[in-house]
Amino acid sequence: MAPLITNIYTADPSAHVFNGKLYIYPSHDRETDIQFNDNGDQYDMADYHVFSLDSLDPPSEVTDHGVVLKVEDIPWVSKQLWAPDAATKDGKYYLYFPARDKEGIFRIGVAVSDKPEGPFTPDPEPIKGSYSIDPAVFVDDDGSAYMYFGGLWGGQLQCYQKGNNIFDAEWSGPKEPSGSGAKALGPRVAKLTDDMRQFAEEVREIVILAPETGEPLAADDHDRRFFEAAWMHKYNGKYYFSYSTGDTHYLVYAVGDSPYGPFTYGGRILEPVLGWTTHHSIVEFQGRWWLFHHDCELSKGVDHLRSVKVKEIWYDKDGKIVTEKPE
């Protein structure tokens, strides 16, 4: 499978269909002298590009709309514009992004445009009560919008075990709960306000259940527990929450009846690829379902120089996601 974008290195693709066209909102990888570490310091991204195309089969020419937002534009940000997402409401387009503030703590910001391709104007402060990384915004059928977020280790989610807005620096770095009886840390969700720029409620923790027991996944279940890269989509009235398992490099999903969960683990979507991280999105476009992800094939394995790829996915008669077309 060839990379979809080759003019620059891109990762963490959030794909959306706006006005009949497919738009991709990735992070922008760049060369750096920072050494690889489990905190993710080598992912030193400084701006965002937006891409668009008219078809996927065959792929049409990809348009790079250029830099739409950069670190220098955002008063509260110090560095690391990591995986973004986008949403639309009432003719406005919103770009959601994580970044480190001046104290080195990850927050989530929002920037606004009149066009899906930007450029985007950032709000001067991060979303109040936001923390960690990997925002993914899902707009339900009734127009309600929800933000899913969180990431372990360098994403700092494990630093908030004492509660929302209580940052425990002792948990900084590549750490997470472990050991007998420890439950996996869940991703976070909050409904957004009508203007799409703040949380409308207290942030909640999502519970992902093991199908064989109905109990929350254990912290030591690294093949299934949440690590980062939240995404939500809906199919046949069910909510599909997908995510990366991080250090085991799987893309997996869980299914529930509410945007708040709980979600029951459903299986793997993608096996490990070349490169440390897996981050994705799932979107319906022109009547077919597509999985966007990234790997390091184009850079010949350089971990922080990734490239967006896309593959088709399907659902079987039971609603399970499959990567080969059912008979």
Swiss-Prot record:
Q: How is it used?
A: Combining xylanase Xyn11A and xylosidases Xyl43A and/or Xyl43B leads to the release of reducing sugars as high as 1.29 folds of the sum of that released by each enzyme, which contributes to the formulation of optimised enzyme mixtures for the efficient hydrolysis of plant biomass.
**InterPro entries reported for this sequence:** Glyco_hydro_43 (IPR006710), Glyco_hydro_beta-prop_sf (IPR023296), Glycosyl_Hydrlase_43_Enz (IPR052176)
Ordered alphabetically, the record's keywords are: Carbohydrate metabolism, Glycosidase, Hydrolase, Polysaccharide degradation, Secreted
GO BP terms:
polysaccharide catabolic process
Gene3D superfamilies, alphabetically?
Glycosyl hydrolase domain, family 43
Please verify whether the record's keywords include Glycoprotein: no
Q: How does activity depend on temperature?
A: Optimum temperature is 50 degrees Celsius.
| GO cellular component labels | extracellular region
Q: What reaction gets catalysed by this protein?
A: Hydrolysis of (1->4)-beta-D-xylans, to remove successive D-xylose residues from the non-reducing termini; Hydrolysis of terminal non-reducing alpha-L-arabinofuranoside residues in alpha-L-arabinosides
* Primary site of residence: secreted
Name the family: Belongs to the glycosyl hydrolase 43 family.
Q: Relate the protein's function as given in its record.
A: Bifunctional beta-xylosidase/alpha-L-arabinosidases with a low level of xylanase activity. Is most active on 4-nitrophenyl beta-D-xylopyranoside (pNPX) (defined as 100%), moderate on p-nitrophenyl-alpha-L-arabinofuranoside (pNPA) (23.7%), and weak on beechwood xylan (15.9%) and birchwood xylan (15.2%). Is able to attack xylooligosacchardies with degrees of polymerisation of 2-5, releasing the amounts of reducing sugars in the order of xylopentose > xylotetraose > xylotriose > xylobiose, i.e. the rate of xylose released from xylooligosacchardies increased with the chain length.
Q: What is the protein named?
A: Xylosidase/arabinosidase 43A
Organism of origin: Humicola insolens (Soft-rot fungus)
Q: What gene, per UniProt, encodes this protein?
A: XylL43A
